[in-house]
């Protein structure tokens, strides 16, 4: 199915070649009633051929206004925020990832006058390089004689594939506003081509050299990358960020309102850092030098696929030997506080009664039931116990002195009696042992005497 716009274009080309003067008059007559219809078709970019355009949710209609291509506008006369450029539908914004070239015919469609997209694009290029004499005819007084510089210097992809938008170089003043809207968009798309279409988020292209339609998004253009309105990674900061830092902070190499490009250059040498990449507005600082630095100069820089060094991935932990210091004192490596031991608990654990004192209190060292205890020792023991009972419950130095004297007297008598008794016991034990030895010797001698007599008798011969 051929759209109404394409049919009108083909019919216009044929009629201009046959009857140039008559076509100029007919074109002037049809120019005013078809002005609004052609502007809407040029803004909508021929969405009738695209089956995907029918499924688009909503397309914001064109509203004529002040042409604004600054940082706050989108080039369509609608003054919106530059950061919200993706809020429109896919069929309206050429830089949207859902945008598909509407001039390309659907699959399986063939026309006699319309060739393949490659032939069509090459035909458009040849027409721009060698314009036909029909295009160089002198315009009428009602027509615009001076096309904008964007038509002469920046041929857009729409001009390559839309004969209507390419050949209508002589416009009336009423048509100039809608034409400049398309030219602003085309100029933005043309300037995006050296940077791999950053608004569509493309890091690579399948056919970068053979793709004349650079405005295609991430679906037909085989392009993919990070989502839009996101700054490039940290390792990709460098000279192409522009004088005002990355992102839409200021007019970068794309001009006002244009999206910032993808990083097409290698990262700068770490040793040659300076105020250039920083910018006057204070952009993010360049990455620090890599870990592998030679003594005489920088070593090989980090490649794009290599992960960043450890010092770029977050805050470093202190060395293992030095624990971190928290607001309440030193902390261990697990994040908890290092608690100092309580000295009171240590004293309670370490402190204990001596084993000697405990044995003296538990075991009575001076029992009275022993055989060496005499009546005198028992009387001294009773006096000592009496004074000890009087000292319990109150403190008396004089009574305590008497207790110590009585205690020393009892201990001396008790130990002397015990030693005397042990000596006597030892003497008796020795005497018993000696007596037992004598008895054994006597018994052994007595038993040996009869044996000797019997032996003597045995040596005497019988008569």
From Swiss-Prot:
Q: Which residue ranges does the record annotate as region 7 X approximate tandem repeats?
A: 87-142
> What cellular component terms from Gene Ontology apply here?
nucleus
Comp. bias intervals (Basic and acidic residues): 430-441
**Gene Ontology biological process terms in this record:** dorsal/ventral pattern formation; follicle cell of egg chamber development; intracellular mRNA localization; negative regulation of translation; oogenesis; pole plasm mRNA localization; protein localization
Signal sequence span is none
| UniProt biased composition (Low complexity) | 14-50, 142-193
Q: Where is the composition biased (Pro residues)?
A: 225-270, 282-291
Where composition is biased (Polar residues), the residues are: 1-13, 85-94, 194-214
Instruction: Give the annotated DNA-binding region, as residue ranges.
Output: 397-416
Localization (cell): Nucleus
Where does each sequence repeat begin and end? 87-94, 95-102, 103-110, 111-118, 119-126, 127-134, 135-142
Task: Look up keyword Nucleus and say if it applies.
Answer: yes
List UniProt keywords, sorted A-Z.
Answer: DNA-binding, Nucleus, Repeat
Region annotated Disordered, chain positions: 1-304, 426-463
- Grouped into one coarse class, the protein's main location is nucleus
Q: Superkingdom of the source?
A: Eukaryota
What Gene Ontology molecular-function terms does this entry list?
A: DNA binding
Subunit details for this protein? Interacts (via N-terminus) with sqd; the interaction is direct and may be involved in localization of sqd to the oocyte during oogenesis.
State its role. Answer: May be involved in localization of sqd to the oocyte during oogenesis.
Q: What name has this protein been given in UniProt?
A: DNA-binding protein K10
